[in-house]
Curated annotation (Swiss-Prot):
Pathway: Glycolipid biosynthesis; lipid IV(A) biosynthesis; lipid IV(A) from (3R)-3-hydroxytetradecanoyl-[acyl-carrier-protein] and UDP-N-acetyl-alpha-D-glucosamine: step 6/6. Transfers the gamma-phosphate of ATP to the 4'-position of a tetraacyldisaccharide 1-phosphate intermediate (termed DS-1-P) to form tetraacyldisaccharide 1,4'-bis-phosphate (lipid IVA). Its EC number is 2.7.1.130. Keywords: ATP-binding, Kinase, Lipid A biosynthesis, Lipid biosynthesis, Lipid metabolism, Nucleotide-binding, Transferase. It catalyses: a lipid A disaccharide + ATP = a lipid IVA + ADP + H(+). This is Tetraacyldisaccharide 4'-kinase. ATP binds at residues 55-62.
Amino acid sequence: MRAPDFWYTPPQAPALLARLLQPFGKIYGMATARRLAKGTPVKLDVPVICVGNLNAGGTGKTPTVIAVLTTLMDMLETPHVVTRGYGGSLKGPVRVDPSKHTAKQVGDEPLLLAAFAEVWVARDRAAGCAAAAQGGASVVVLDDGFQNPSVHKDFSLIVVDAEKGFGNGRCLPAGPLREPVDIGLKRADALLSVGAAEAQARFDSSTLPTDLPHIRGALTPLQTGMDWSDMRAIAFAGIAHPEKFFATLRALGANVVHSEPLDDHQPLSTALMSRLEADAKRQNAQLVTTEKDAARLPNSFRTKVITLPVRLSFDGQENALADLLRPVVKS
């Protein structure tokens, strides 16, 4: 499912459907608040760093987790990731093994993250964090889980798409929010907005807590030596905002002769891939997708599709993430 357009109308001028759904949004927000108030969070013997969001859907969270992992490893830490494994069938806790697990079992994001660090899939986040700590983690990176009260977080980093912001400011299903912005940011330790300079400038003009550390980053294509200029490409993406992936390809100079937006985490069936392959042959084009989608490719198509990896960069704030995390792991 892709986010509906009415989620991202201006808060001061919400769409009719957002206004009609507003009572349900209030109920959702209250349900989140009640869930957060329940029970006592489990505190581990190792720090837990949560990378979460207030919005449903893509905010740049996965590249942020990768950036957090590399930053922690630069500090000589041994981070393990704990994630729910959205789209996978295994309940866990289970340590992800890319040599034997598939996206159908553990989800696409865990397979992608497993290239950088040990990853645990667990529907029960507390059990997953405990397994990671027992498995040798010196610090646990909780992928999502900001609205999960079962685990004590030593540091919570909220990620937001600078272009989309917090949408129309309403909770699901009236808007994209899992909880009201003001309530969520009060529990956060820092905010990371992801986007180009123009989007960052617009986001900066919105009302944010002045005492909350705010760092800015952008998703930039990883330099792999691939010459994208004038490449005829058929691009497909099953992520929250596939249009951003297509725009990135065009910005690199690729001639995107066809773009196929898919639902977030949509299974890449053999029938779908065979159709795209036939289109590519007919138009003398190359199939291109995202790293996350590549994790869901049928084995027979893995050598036929090129991926465009992106990483989080911090222009002028290269040490900002390390400065935030160092006190957490060195305390």
